[in-house]
Amino acid sequence: MTAAGDFASLSDGETFLLLAALVAVIGSILVTTLRTGVPPMPSTSHVAATMLALVPADTRGVIYELGAGWGGFAVRLAWRGPAARVIAYELSPLPFIVAKALQWLSRCRNLEVRYGNFMSRPLGDGAVVTCYLMIGAMVRLAPKLRAELPAGSLVVSNAFTLPDWPPERVVTVTAYQNTPVYLYRQPLAAQEASATPVG
């Protein structure tokens, strides 16, 4: 029997439950997207590979993946940097559940997928931050990273810039629509300025 035949054989109650579940899933993603301004879109394989190459494989400490989506990139980060602790944040319920399942299936001991808004979480122990966010989220994130990240920390961003923060390097992924990947480094001066008493 074909898939269409299987669907046609469902009772009215089963069809209603299936459609209700589908609407709930789509609604959940839509509500979270409207709330955060960031849909759960995965990075393409070419862009993800470029981002990974900008993260030192010998990174120690914490790597934050902000807006983990479905979790695929977070797993790759954990595989690439076994000496690091990868903490991935996701706020959309369904992608979070999938990412959490992927964490379990990958058996990466150095990966932790967390449900929550990274804007309300401290990031001051981050050695590296990776993100694929939209413009509005980057505007809100930039001052938080400036204020919290230790000197020398790296930020790797897919496609979107951090306002008023010149990148150390920009890599254009020609294999996918000339997508830019930005590498930022937290300058020592920013930390010194925040630690210097005024008056």
Stretch-by-stretch model annotation:
Residues 71-75:
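Glycine-rich SAM-binding Motif I of class I
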Residues 137-198:
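C-terminal substrate-binding/active-site "lid" region of AdoMet-derived donor-dependent transferases
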Residues 59-69:
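Conserved class I S-adenosyl-L-methionine
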Residues 85-90:
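Conserved SAM-binding motif I beta-strand of class I
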